[in-house]
Amino acid sequence: MKTLVLFIIFGLAALFLLSSANELEETERGCQKFFWTCHPGQPPCCSGLACTWPTEICILGR
């Protein structure tokens, strides 16, 4: 039982660390991903994506 609790705690800690590292990578990149909003003043859409006019979201570019 103690082993299971430790396994769960370490698993959650690893998941938290991985998600934090992924978030840092995304914020450093500085571009909006697929279906993210692309309002003026925000970073531009990522490569291969284009900002649509009426909905202001990043979709597959032309």
From Swiss-Prot:
Disulfide bonds, paired cysteine numbers: C31-C46, C38-C51, C45-C58
Signal peptide: 1-21
Pfam families (UniProt xref): Toxin_12
Disulfide bond recorded as keyword: yes
Taxonomic superkingdom: Eukaryota
Gene Ontology molecular function, alphabetical: ion channel inhibitor activity; toxin activity
Propeptide: 22-29
Function: Probable ion channel inhibitor.
Domain notes: The presence of a 'disulfide through disulfide knot' structurally defines this protein as a knottin.
The protein's name: U8-theraphotoxin-Cg1a 1
Species for this entry: Chilobrachys guangxiensis (Chinese earth tiger tarantula)
Lineage: Eukaryota, Metazoa, Ecdysozoa, Arthropoda, Chelicerata
